[in-house]
Swiss-Prot record:
Modified positions (Phosphothreonine) in chain numbering: T118
Main location: secreted
Pfam families hit by this protein: DUF4616
Stretches the record annotates as Disordered: 28-47, 103-138, 232-254, 494-526
UniProt-recorded name of the protein: Uncharacterized protein C14orf93 homolog
Keywords (A to Z) from UniProt: Isopeptide bond, Phosphoprotein, Secreted, Signal, Ubl conjugation
GO cellular component terms listed in the entry, alphabetical order: extracellular region
Localisation: Secreted
Amino acid sequence: MSFSATILFSPPSGSEARCCCCACKSETSQGSTGSQGGNPPASTPITVTGHGLAVQSSEQLLHIIYQRVDKAVGLAEAALGLARANNELLKQLQEEVGELRQGKVCTADEDRESRARTPPPEEPGVLKGSPGEASNSLPAMEEECDSVGSGVQVVIEELRQLGAASTVGQGPLGFFAAPQRDARLPGCTLAAVEGAPLLNPMADDYVASEGSIQRVLVPAYAKQLSPATQLAIQRASSETGPESGTKLPATRPEGVLGSAALDSALDESGAGGAGELSRSLGFVGSPCRIRGTGQKNSRRKRDLVLSKLVHNVHNHITNDKRFNGSESIKSSWNISVVKFLLEKLKQELMVSPHNYTDKELKGACVAYFLTKRREYRNSLNPFKGLKEKEEKKLRSRRYRLFANRSSIMRHFGPEDQHLWKDVTEELMSDEEDSLNEPGVWVARSPRFRAQRLTELCYHLDANSKHGTKANRVYGPPSDRLPSVEAQLLPPELYNPNFQEDEGGGNEKGPVSPSYDQPHKTSCPDLNSFIEIKVEKDEYTL
């Protein structure tokens, strides 16, 4: 949608008027001087209404007008998308009303059966009772739906004419300053429609019209959101930047279900225009967008491009302002380093296609400080740092082994799949680096794992690409102890008597720690798989 406007502005002189909003004084003084001097009358200055607005020059006024027109364009496009989505919902309601007009009215017997099954609802407008009562309530419902349909059509037509009306209006440039008004259908809670000029004189008539015109959504679909509506909200939050930091007013308890969650999401994204959009259009929100964002308490991944840029700027050879890991992030030196990095990052990103907010830039700097802090702590205790690094490596390998085994579990029977359903990564083997042969991984199964699950893991490894690698051999059981979560697993997965079984095995004979034939003690009935593995190892060596 394109706009073109010609703005004539002549600021009054200092002797005539001190404020550009005093149009009356400027006009009278300019008219008197024009009539006396014979010069052509000067252009009437444009008056701008707003809260705390003081225009000092014509360039500033043009800039403000451009910002508000651009903001109105984005809101109008998003409003048109919302109106179209609401119109689709209204069509579905009109189809149901059409079926009722054709004579599909509940009979008295059906009403008695429905009353016996379910309690009578409290919402008015539902067809219950005798046929006479149903026939009396049917015309009222038809009139209600007709008024809703006409109201939605008026909204759509006004939104389509919104762009062209921006060059027609001669009034002041006011944006979303009207008080909020509510209009709700009986038996359903709908959002309010806030009156706003929107550069359109027809909007004032729309706000002053009857409440039936303001009804946009219908009760049957008030708790749903169409994909088009979600797309319109996302476009509004992306196109309208953080120009205003106003917060939305708190919704009342009898308000729309999920509207508070949607408004808070728009506020957190920094889109002030989107917040005004939800207030001005009376949009009925739903928490489905929040539920679809991912798992609860999931770890947010950092932007790799931004993290790499922070790393390069901080570790540049010419940079002498670097983080001090021995101090807190709130120390004066580290705060100065963060400010320095923010300035350098903004300079680097001026010609970059990536657009990052100040909050994202600061978060990347703090994340890199935590990395330096961790390096400093590990340097104080090298053994602890190496131990944590080794544990992290083994845990990562267990996760990878668990994912590899789970990917081929669909080829096994239903009994094995049922057993694998409650398996966690803690029950996987520790794939340690061999001390004798570089590049060889020694798989050491946990001692607390049940024998049945151990046999299933051997079968999975024999049928997987990862398990049949030549550089992967089996070793003695691991010394890792079970966690509290592992001790709650069923006996098919967790062996609670693993320490007693280990003691009994030591009485019979010591377990051989050799890596050449370690399988015969842990899984003696799977020698066929082990022999194939040993042949591959001897062939490669």
